[in-house]
Structures are given as structure tokens and as C-alpha cells.
């Protein structure tokens, strides 16, 4: 039903693309991150929850955005299309396609951990499941969110006692709002970089409850930064903007913090393992929950996932992509290179590609079926 082209995944029967890489006439979009939402398309179909952030990011192309409720079916040239929660960020969706009795689901980016800032991931039964694999290696297993946010708040409180401002870096759309939701506002004021503040205001307008925040530049002007935590995109580290806060302790929240040496390479004082993607056992459990007989793997460490699923008896192959999700090669320690290397295949107009050549030991990476069920 879908084939890869030089513009991304194409549904020939419906004549539309899913998360295209280049401008097209009609795009069905999973979410508003830049590697999925492309400027210049004539028409976009997104979820109701994701419409505001999509329009904000599209600028002059925002007029082409149409939105549907989760679970609401649209028929596009005979193909029944519906969007279902992906749990990645506000409005993130999986795309379900049904045509002539065949059902495909495109996951987009997703996580199965609960998140108060977006609708929870929903397993959707299908014949073919296209899954991301950003953290598709057995070394990626997330600690509990309670533990992570406990560590973040303790770090912030310790910095406050020592008279330093705390800078916590996370991507401006999605990660930043999830971080804000987990902070303890009794410790001190929560300040936001401009890029974060705009997206945070859209989350609030969308009904997401978040602690009070203040625009960081306003706090700088009035010198009200004592004991504060500043939520900002990673690009601010080492900037003149950051130096205006005086003595600062820095941290980065990402799934990459699970890998040895990532904090040092990021040049931050602390690292917290918090991802908006599935980890290894969650990915395997999500595939099981769909009941899919065929799995196509993209956006990340495709080879190990394909090998594992093939060993389980599934028809699994990799789909080449221009993007690698949030892959950060700088975060991979040289000592982990043997399990973190994958052949990158150039996109082509041919049918979906075969698996890449990365290897893995399935016996060393079995997920516990009782502890790796998806969160619904």
C-alpha cells in the first residue's frame, strides 16, 4: 500500500504522502517536528490536537492545514485514513490506512510511557506496521519517570541552595513541556527561553495543565533569576545569552544520556535519561500489540530491530530514510561503536528496501513479557 520514493512514503492508491521530505500536493503528517512536517505542501492532514503547533511551525503554509479527531476516518481516493494517538508530543499521531481489506499503520515517532502533556499511545491492530527505531538497541532501557524527575528536582534544589541558576536543555517542542510538567514549582521560578515559551503557550491553549512559567528574558531584565530553573533548547549552551544568568549549572534531558560519555560530549554538568521515544523492550512490546505480520523499520537503528523481529518469525525489513529521528552520533561512546553502527541507505524510488547489515545477539536482549507491556 505504501512505497518509498525520493519524497518519502507514498500511498499510490490514495495519491498522498505520509511525512514527506519535500513539498507535495497532499501530506498526512504524524506530528510537528521538523523531520516529519515539511514546508511547502498544498494540503496537510493532522490531528486536532496537533493543528495549532503545526500551523505555528508552517508559517505561510498554515492555511493548508486540515485537522481530524483521533479515530475519525477520512476517505482519500478510496483509502480510509484515520489518526490515532502516538504519545510522542502534543497531537502526535499514528496513521492507519485501510484499502481493499488490507490495514497498514505508520507509527511516526512514539512512546508508550505515560505523559501528562499528550494523549497516550494507542495500539492499533494491522497487517503491516511501520515503526521508528530511534533507540532500537538493547542498551536503551528507560528508568522510571518518577526516578528521573526526582533526580531533576533534587539537582535543581541543590543548585538553588548553592546560589546557582539551573539550565535544563530539551527540544523546544515536546520535551520542554514534558520537563516543565514534571518540575516542582515550590523549589523556585521556572523560566523559559523564547522558543520554548511560544510552544508552551500553545500547549496551554490546547488544554494541557502546566506549572506557571515566565519568559526568561523578562526575568533577566528585572534580575529575578535567583533559584530559577531555565528550560531552553540545547543550542543555548555556551551562548552569550546564557552567560547573562551568571553562575549556571547545566543539564540535558534525552534518551542519549543513557549512553556512556554523552554528558561529557554535550558539555553539560548533568544528564538525565528522558526520551519521547520507545526504548528497546517498549518497541518490541508495541510491535507485538499491533498483531502485525509484516514490520517495516525506519528512523534509527533499523538493522538490530529487523534482525530481532526476523528471528521471531516476522516479515521484517528496513525502510531507508533521509532522517535518523533524534540520533546523535556525538553521544555514542567509542566503546559502544560495535553495537551502535548501522549502514545508512540512500532513499530511492524502489519498493521498500531490505534490512541493513547491523547485527545483534537475540539471546542477550529478550524483553520480559510481563514488564515490557505497552502503557495505554
Would you name each region that the model predicts?
Residues 48, 63-68, 187-194, 313-322:
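Short hydrophobic/aromatic-enriched beta-strand-loop microsegments
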Residues 37, 92, 114-115, 176-179, ...:
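Short, well-ordered alpha-helical microsegments
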Residues 149-231:
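Hard-cation-handling environments
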Residues 87-97, 110, 114-115, 121, ...:
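Active-site-proximal loop/helix segment associated with metal-binding centers of metalloenzymes
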Residues 8-21, 72-75, 212-226, 234-242:
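Short acidic low-complexity segments
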Residues 55-56, 76-78, 115-117, 139-141, ...:
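Short, charged, surface-exposed secondary-structure boundary motifs
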Residues 185, 216-363, 368-376:
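C-terminal regulatory/interaction regions
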Residues 2-22, 26, 32-169, 174, ...:
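His/Asp/Glu-rich metal-coordinating catalytic cores
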Amino acid at each position: 500500500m505504501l512505497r518509498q520514493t525520493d519524497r518519502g512514503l507514498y500511498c499510490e492508491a490514495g495519491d498522498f504522502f505520509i511525512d514527506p521530505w519535500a513539498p507535495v500536493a497532499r501530506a498526512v503528517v504524524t506530528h510537528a517536528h521538523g523531520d516529519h512536517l515539511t514546508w511547502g505542501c498544498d494540503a496537510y492532514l493532522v490531528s486536532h490536537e496537533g493543528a495549532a503547533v503545526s500551523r505555528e511551525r508552517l508559517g505561510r503554509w498554515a492555511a493548508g492545514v486540515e485537522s481530524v479527531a483521533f479515530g475519525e476516518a477520512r476517505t482519500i481516493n478510496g483509502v480510509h485514513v484515520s489518526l490515532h494517538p502516538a504519545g510522542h508530543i502534543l497531537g502526535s499521531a499514528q496513521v492507519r490506512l485501510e484499502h481493499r481489506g488490507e490495514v497498514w499503520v505508520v507509527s511516526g515517532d512514539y512512546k508508550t510511557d505515560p505523559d501528562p502533556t499528550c494523549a497516550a499511545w494507542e495500539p492499533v491492530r494491522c497487517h503491516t506496521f511501520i515503526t521508528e527505531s530511534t533507540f532500537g538497541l538493547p542498551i536503551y532501557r528507560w528508568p522510571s519517570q518518577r526516578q528521573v524527575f526526582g533526580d531533576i528536582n533534587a539537582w535543581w534544589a541543590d543548585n538553588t541552595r548553592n546560589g546557582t541558576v539551573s539550565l535544563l536543555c530539551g527540544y523546544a517542542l515536546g520535551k520542554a513541556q514534558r520537563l516543565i510538567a514534571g518540575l516542582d514549582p515550590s523549589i523556585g521560578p521556572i523560566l523559559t527561553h523564547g522558543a520554548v515559551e511560544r510552544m508552551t503557550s500553545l500547549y496551554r491553549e490546547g488544554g494541557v495543565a502546566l506549572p506557571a512559567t515566565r519568559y526568561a528574558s523578562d526575568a533577566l531584565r528585572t534580575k529575578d533569576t535567583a533559584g530559577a530553573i531555565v528550560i531552553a533548547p540545547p543550542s543555548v549552551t555556551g551562548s552569550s545569552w546564557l552567560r547573562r544568568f551568571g553562575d549556571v549549572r547545566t543539564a540535558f534531558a534525552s534518551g542519549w544520556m543513557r549512553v556512556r560519555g554523552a554528558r561529557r560530549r554535550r558539555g553539560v554538568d548533568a544528564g538525565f535519561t528522558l526520551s519521547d521515544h520507545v526504548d528497546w523492550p517498549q518497541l518490541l512490546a508495541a510491535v507485538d500489540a499491533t498483531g502485525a505480520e509484516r514490520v517495516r523499520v525506519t528512523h534509527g537503528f533499523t538493522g538490530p530491530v529487523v534482525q530481532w523481529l526476523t528471528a521471531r518469525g516476522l516479515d521484517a525489513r528496513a525502510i531507508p530514510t533521509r532522517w535518523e529521528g533524534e540520533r546523535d552520533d556525538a553521544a555514542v561512546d567509542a566503546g559502544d561503536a560495535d553495537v551502535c553502527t548501522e549502514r545508512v541507505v540512500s532513499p530511492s524510488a524502489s519498493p521498500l528496501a531490505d534490512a541493513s547489515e547491523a547485527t545483534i545477539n537475540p539471546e542477550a536482549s529478550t524483553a520480559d513479557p510481563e514488564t515490557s507491556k505497552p502503557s495505554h
